[in-house]
């Protein structure tokens, strides 16, 4: 992998000079192979090491180079043709392949090549961008968007119309991460590299970016960019410094352990505020 890293880093330094006509064969093959590895889940843009999420920026650079160098092509679909630089992930799948991977994809869901979808996953009509990683047992409901490089954990439920923000540029930005066993309520937006930690429940219509205040009503603590594990979060507001108006905030109304989460319905947790 070190060889790939060096080739990609060197190519990215020259990205404004490189094009389809002058790129060398080794660099082109490396870029395509990195995207193949992403597509198969053998590498990922971000991974958790020693309980800390680490972003592999060189993989993001590979995606950008792939997009710079690819030409638009026509892709055939059952309902429409498409014209894009990145092919569709499942354009060559047959029934046997879907069954082997235990994935259900409902039309007209769009999943771009270079994203990874693990087994036992259901994808309703939605959009999954390149570089995204969706782990096993996850449900992506209707009109949900999983942005570029977003990381979705195991047994996650992304409800209808949810937006999970993508990030390719600026390079220093980290991807949005939804950890294992989370529930994201309908029409919520989690963006700008925010991390929703394991076992959290986000109510309908909650918007969280890096500048959003995340208020823990039990402790009075205000967080940014991270929802702690096993939190139940709803939309709310906090008074301004001069107390003349209120500003939007996400409010942690309670924390629940995994046993409670397994026993109690999500709707009940949100009602008992």
From Swiss-Prot:
One Pfam family it belongs to: THDPS_N_2
Keyword match Repeat: yes
Domain of life of the organism encoding this protein: Bacteria
Principal place of residence: cytoplasm
GO molecular function: 2,3,4,5-tetrahydropyridine-2,6-dicarboxylate N-succinyltransferase activity; nucleotidyltransferase activity
UniProtKB keywords: Acyltransferase, Amino-acid biosynthesis, Cytoplasm, Diaminopimelate biosynthesis, Lysine biosynthesis, Repeat, Transferase
Cross-referenced InterPro entries: DapD_Trfase_Hexpep_rpt_fam, Hexapep, THP_succinylTrfase_dom1, THP_succinylTrfase_N_sf, Trimer_LpxA-like_sf
SUPFAM superfamilies: Trimeric LpxA-like enzymes
Key word Flavoprotein present: no
Major enzyme class: transferase
Subcellular compartments: Cytoplasm
Protein name per the record: 2,3,4,5-tetrahydropyridine-2,6-dicarboxylate N-succinyltransferase
Source organism: Buchnera aphidicola subsp. Schizaphis graminum (strain Sg)
Encoding gene (name): dapD
